[in-house]
């Protein structure tokens, strides 16, 4: 039996689910009467989405469709960081949507301090874009998971728990 147990806290999303969501959004935009002739393009790049459409009104409608479809496919809306829309050539509007993946150092430090202040029986280590929480009993780790889940709204990033050992 192991003398210590641990798990990792990460911020990640399933890229294939995002691709499927974008396919649904494109299909929905093509079928909706008010968006049919907007000539909307949604491009997925490595770390961002680029939405190009006819006007601010259609951009807002496409954002709403994106949020709805992402929620239905169990993608957290916290992965989307909507930037301010900018004008593109030909009376079109472009919006860049950054995709949040991984814990920044600032958020990892905040999470680490939060867990250390509340729970004295666990140790917290920042490992790149994840945080490892280690404890002597599984009950301590369960308490840490409940604490982190309760404080997830303060951190403004989606959190998952991996490598529970």
Swiss-Prot record:
InterPro entries: DUF520, UPF0234-like_C, UPF0234_N, YajQ-like_sf. It comes from the Bacteria. GO terms for cellular component: cytosol. Keywords: Nucleotide-binding. CDD domains: YajQ_like. The keyword Nucleotide-binding applies. Belongs to the YajQ family. Nucleotide-binding protein. PANTHER family: UPF0234 PROTEIN YAJQ. HAMAP family: YajQ (MF_00632). This is Nucleotide-binding protein Syncc9605_0652. It comes from Synechococcus sp. (strain CC9605).
């Amino acid at each position: 039996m192991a003398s210590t147990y641990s798990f990792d806290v990460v911020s990640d999303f399933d890229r294939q689910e995002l691709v499927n969501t974008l396919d649904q959004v494109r299909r929905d935009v093509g079928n909706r009467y008010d968006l049919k002739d907007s000539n909307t393009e949604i491009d997925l790049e490595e770390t961002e989405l680029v939405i190009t459409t006819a006007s601010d009104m259609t951009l807002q409608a496409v954002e709403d469709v994106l949020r709805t479809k992402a929620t239905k496919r169990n993608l957290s809306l916290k992965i989307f960081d909507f930037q301010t829309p900018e004008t593109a050539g030909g009376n079109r509007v472009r919006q860049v949507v950054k995709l949040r993946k991984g814990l920044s150092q600032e958020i990892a430090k905040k999470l680490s301090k939060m867990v250390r202040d509340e729970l004295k029986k666990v140790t917290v280590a920042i490992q790149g874009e994840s945080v490892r929480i280690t404890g002597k009993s599984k009950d301590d780790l369960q308490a840490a998971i409940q604490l982190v889940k309760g404080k997830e709204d303060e951190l403004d990033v989606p959190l998952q728990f991996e490598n529970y050992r």
